[in-house]
């Protein structure tokens, strides 16, 4: 995990073509890779000092790139062009042919990724297509220090149908830590953060984990969708177990309800809607108390807006299933 991570891939003086006037003006160009601070982009400053003074640059987000190309020498010497899928372009010239070639190769690798088979850039990309596709499903986050973990900093976060994974920012094959979705007690987001609280059913241990990110809403929606899918699956298991018990006890006076499956359940805000058929009275009681509190809570509260609802725990799980204090 990178604690001293820098998102600057390349920078230097170039002459960039103005979109309005079509003339080339000298500027300090900074190419930043995607990170917890923002997407992949070009930042144009008047000079190098403006970067140190944290001036406000003109930003071009580098997404939906069709190709990166070198302009013919008879058209413009030492020039590089980024062509986007909407056929717009950003063109700049460099002070030397060597510098132009370096910009071209860097932009090609960072912007085109797996589409470099026809570009002679040295060693081939060793990542399999499946692994490369997987990279697009990872989010840029910065894990804030927490007592449970000895790692923090810039990393990649991935959500699957069962787990949340953290991957090393420099080596996409190195997994740093994981949390089962069923161990989440609550989760939330705001404009710059995604936060969740995990229980004891994970290797990292229980605790609150906070990530600085510009993609908090997308991460939240992924986690919430996966959590609801687990809840739906659990509901189907309960219904099937209840059906089997009814068949076994058919014709007898004694009726026993099925036991709750041993799998721990995610405690999302909508849990009681899905498991309400298991115990209508209990779900109604939770809903009456929970929703009143939820509606009274502030929209800006990152965690307290989420209701901690779960099915009634078995006696053996009573110590684990206690709702954490707010």
From Swiss-Prot:
Keyword Phosphoprotein in record: yes
GO cellular component: cytoplasm; cytosol
PH domain sequence ranges: 7-112
Pfam family, one: PH
Key words of the record: Phosphoprotein
Gene Ontology biological-process annotations: cell surface receptor protein tyrosine kinase signaling pathway; nervous system development; positive regulation of MAPK cascade
Highest taxon in the source lineage: Eukaryota
Motif (DKFBH motif): 265-275
Tissue: Widely expressed. High expression in skeletal muscle, heart, kidney and liver. Weaker expression in spleen, lung and small intestine, brain, heart and. Expressed in both resting and activated peripheral blood T-cells.
InterPro entries (alphabetical): Docking_Protein_DOK, DOK4/5/6_PH, IRS_PTB, PH-like_dom_sf, PH_domain
IRS-type PTB domain span: 132-237
Modifications the protein undergoes after translation, according to the UniProt entry: Phosphorylated on tyrosine residues in response to insulin, IGF1 or RET stimulation.
Functional note: DOK proteins are enzymatically inert adaptor or scaffolding proteins. They provide a docking platform for the assembly of multimolecular signaling complexes. DOK4 functions in RET-mediated neurite outgrowth and plays a positive role in activation of the MAP kinase pathway. Putative link with downstream effectors of RET in neuronal differentiation. May be involved in the regulation of the immune response induced by T-cells.
Family: Belongs to the DOK family. Type B subfamily.
Entry text on domains: PTB domain mediates receptor interaction.
Quaternary structure and partners: Interacts with RET and TEK/TIE2. Interaction with RET is mediated through the PTB domain and requires phosphorylation of RET 'Tyr-1062'.
Protein name: Docking protein 4
Organism: Homo sapiens (Human)
Name of encoding gene: DOK4
